[in-house]
Amino acid sequence: MKLLLQRLNVTNVSSTSVKVSAFSKSITIPYLEKHMELKQLFKASAIATALVLAGCGGDINISEGDIDNSVTNNNGGNTGGDTGGDTGSDDTAPGEVSSFLSGEVSDAFGQSVEVRVLSGRLTADDADDQGVITLTNDTVWALEGPVFIGNDKADSVTLAIEEGTVIFGRTGADYLVVSRDSKIEAEGTASSPIIMTSFNDVVGDEVGAGQWGGVVILGNGTSTKCPQDGSDCALQVEGAEEGAVFGGTDDTDSSGILKYVVVKYAGFEIAPDNELNGITFGGVGSGTEVDYVQVHSNADDGVEFFGGAVNAKHLVLTANQDDSVDWDNGYKGKLQYVYVQHAADNSDANRGIEGDGDGGDGLEFSKPMLANMTVIGNTFDTADADSEGLLLRDQTGANLMNFLITGPEEIGRAHV
């Protein structure tokens, strides 16, 4: 399903100056290092600001494409849920068709669209003979409550998401969890990314941070909070219900792939210091591929790494209300080509990076490596939070190369 709606425009592009206009709000970026040269504009995708990165030779390239507001129905049948007649539904597909949601989304798009609801735990009983559960792009998928992929180190399956697929949640309690030993294979393309967003975004209502939960990926990587003797470890991850655990001894573990994926309008605070991020990586290993990913307008952190050693490239983190990049628990991965921009309207923002070691015996530190990163702040400043570039706290080190912090005079720069 290809639904393209452009909502972010870049004009006046050069290596030193670029004007970004988001939702009719503009911010002028006065400085851009050559490594972060913005040449073109992302082609926005499926239902809203799906910023599609086309990186080449170390640049983050943002390319402007044609606007296509059409819906391509690849089903070949009449997809409308329980609207009478032949629905064209695949009875072997995961989840249940919702006639209500199908009707709401169909009305918004002006043509028949099938919405299937995913809930509970998806295991081998829901998979094909190869242990794969596939979300196709001829259906829109809704999350209802926590949706777990596999059990922890049991009933392991792979969730395969086709390019151009749209997934949404309706409340902060709707989120996706990939359990240890299960995988997510979410591989979009530059012209047809995978979109995970809110119901409001899908139907064209008012959008904002915190309209659904987010994505949680759990792996078998190391953590400073795990026993350092290599014995069993199962740490409860922030934001998710009990049983969503991570940790182990394998920093090369693979949880699958996220490529050309956009997560928007997510984040949810269960309690202080217990929140869902746009994407949470708990003990995720370096065998996982993360490339060309955007998190936009999240109510908490854009991405957070709890231990592990997963690497990520071509990250775009825009208008997130807390830290854009957060790490702790001994995270040791590599991040390259990272672009952070706080909200253009100077609304809620915090740090471009917040790094911690967070616990353990004091001997193990977080030690990530970052190269080619730009942070553009805004003027947000309150007693509790303000727009800052970098904060490194207890038990963390970091190697930073080609790192730029810029923005208005009010922005906090760096604190170590």
Predicted regions and their residues:
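Bacterial Sec-dependent N-terminal signal peptides
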Residues: 2-47
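Secretory-pathway extracellular proteins and peptide precursors enriched for disulfide-bonded cysteines
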Residues: 47-48, 226
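C-terminal motif of bacterial Sec signal peptides marking the signal peptidase cleavage site
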Residues: 52-55
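Beta-strand/loop edge motif enriched in small/polar residues
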Residues: 57-413
